[in-house]
């Protein structure tokens, strides 16, 4: 039996129009039990200022970003289901969905799936890793009823 514990923190000045806690729970449950039966994740929804600050502090990038992943690494002698934190910037997600002509809810789901895979150790630094990660993301997104997140809705079939 799998269990996913979500700690949802809303730090946006305006919380209108955000996905529901149930949406975030469903998206996590589509990913995490595939890799770990019991897991706990914090998702913090932030505005651009906080995203920019964290991105500059931890990645040296002087801009806000869609999702930041902070994996938790327990000492080897301690077993905890805590995977880590996802920081998702509302304005960047909304802007990207418009620019890429994607459904907003689908883009939110993709950010959660993508960030969760980072917490589980997946990365896209080299082409092989990127391809493996993208294939997993596409499969999970399809399972959730969403289209391939790497093909924008404006792209021809």
Swiss-Prot record:
GO molecular function, one term: RNA endonuclease activity
InterPro entries: MetalPrtase_cat_dom_sf_prd, YbeY, YbeY_CS
Similarity comment: Belongs to the endoribonuclease YbeY family.
HAMAP family for the chain: Endoribonucl_YbeY
Named cofactor requirement(s): Zn(2+)
GO biological process, one term: rRNA processing
Keyword flag Nuclease: yes
SUPFAM superfamilies xref list: Metalloproteases ('zincins'), catalytic domain
Free-text remark on how the cofactor is bound: Binds 1 zinc ion.
Assigned EC number: 3.1.-.-
Organism: Yersinia pseudotuberculosis serotype O:3 (strain YPIII)
Main location: cytoplasm
UniProt keywords, alphabetically: Cytoplasm, Endonuclease, Hydrolase, Metal-binding, Nuclease, Ribosome biogenesis, rRNA processing, Zinc
Protein name: Endoribonuclease YbeY
Single GO cellular component term: cytoplasm
């Amino acid at each position: 039996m799998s269990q996913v514990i979500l700690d949802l923190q809303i730090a946006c000045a305006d919380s209108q129009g955000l996905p529901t806690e149930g949406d975030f729970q469903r998206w996590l449950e589509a990913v995490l039990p595939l890799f770990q039966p019991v897991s706990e994740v914090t998702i913090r929804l932030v505005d651009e200022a906080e995203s920019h600050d964290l991105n500059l502090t931890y990645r040296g990038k002087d801009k806000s970003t869609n999702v930041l992943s902070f994996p938790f690494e327990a000492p080897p002698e301690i077993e905890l289901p805590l995977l880590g934190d996802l920081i998702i910037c509302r304005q960047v997600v909304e802007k990207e969905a418009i620019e890429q002509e994607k459904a907003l809810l689908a883009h939110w789901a993709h950010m959660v799936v993508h960030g969760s895979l980072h917490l589980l150790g997946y990365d896209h630094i080299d082409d092989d890793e990127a391809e493996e990660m993208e294939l997993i993301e596409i499969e999970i997104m399809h399972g959730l009823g969403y289209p391939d997140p790497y093909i924008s809705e404006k792209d021809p079939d």
